[in-house]
Curated annotation (Swiss-Prot):
The keyword Isomerase does not apply. The keyword Transmembrane helix applies. This is Melanocyte-stimulating hormone receptor. GO terms for cellular component: plasma membrane. Interacts with MGRN1, but does not undergo MGRN1-mediated ubiquitination; this interaction competes with GNAS-binding and thus inhibits agonist-induced cAMP production. Interacts with OPN3; the interaction results in a decrease in MC1R-mediated cAMP signaling and ultimately a decrease in melanin production in melanocytes. Residues 1-37, 94-118, 184-191, 267-279 are extracellular. Residues 64-72, 141-163, 212-240, 301-317 are cytoplasmic. GO terms for biological process: adenylate cyclase-activating G protein-coupled receptor signaling pathway. Keywords: Cell membrane, G-protein coupled receptor, Glycoprotein, Lipoprotein, Membrane, Palmitate, Receptor, Transducer, Transmembrane, Transmembrane helix. It is found in: Cell membrane. Receptor for MSH (alpha, beta and gamma) and ACTH. The activity of this receptor is mediated by G proteins which activate adenylate cyclase. Mediates melanogenesis, the production of eumelanin (black/brown) and phaeomelanin (red/yellow), via regulation of cAMP signaling in melanocytes. The gene is MC1R.
Amino acid sequence: MPMQGAQRRLLGSLNSTPTATPNLGLAANHTGAPCLEVSIPDGLFLSLGLVSLVENVLVVAAIAKNRNLHSPMYCFICCLALSDLLVSGSNMLETAVILLLEAGALATRASVVQQLQNTIDVLTCSSMLCSLCFLGAIAVDRYVSIFYALRYHSIVTLPRARRAIAAIWVASVLSSTLFIAYCDHAAVLLCLVVFFLAMLVLMAVLYVHMLARACQHAQGITRLHKRQLPAHQGFGLRGAATLTILLGIFFLCWGPFFLHLMLVVLCPQHLTCSCIFKNFKVFLTLIICNTIIDPLIYAFRSQELCRTLKEVLLCSW
């Protein structure tokens, strides 16, 4: 497969447009109009991927080591870390292969490169879908633990969690294979966009409802102890800020990528859209950043997991 410049990506199935030149500034589109291009150096991209890789490997190792962390909630967190690991790993592999091909250090036939491209595309797409699914699964798990606290352990059992996890992985791999095989069809890209929006709405509805319940609970405690109302208001503000950060990070990191896919369908030849297409690698970098942030939000806030992580690190030395 011929390479088209230093930033040519193997992930061509989801990006039918050229990527950015190695600078930050104004570049011209095909009509000569200026476009703002933001280039992500390969070194920075690989470094972020490596940080994500190490971070998520530690999460998986810590959960696997401690049997106390083998509950459904931590199973979902472990699978989120594993899918994030695959997202960063597949993108790192793709970038490394591109650099080796362009340097002439990896000589192979075009058919082999094409097969490698298809494999990486399926791996990347399926791991992205899994990451989104497990973010939704964690939200559902927390929702059930709050609204059905007394029946939580009978509703969210370990066998059910394992079946849900297996279903997510199988469905993601199968759908990704179909998506990559029929990536030229607009319906495929629209399905991905709709899936992202569905996950965003699901998480927003569940977390907003959980925040409302938490505020009601805090208000009840305030009345019981005859404390002043500002304490409840302060709790509500902190909860709203936490919710805004959680959903904001999710939308900021994933939104641009799916906006790109939507624009590929809606305005592939429009001047403004063509300028946005040039920043495709930036959108992938934001997803890599999300794989770095996810453990900080969902895993490292657990004291039990952090203690196990310290044990893992001490044993490795």
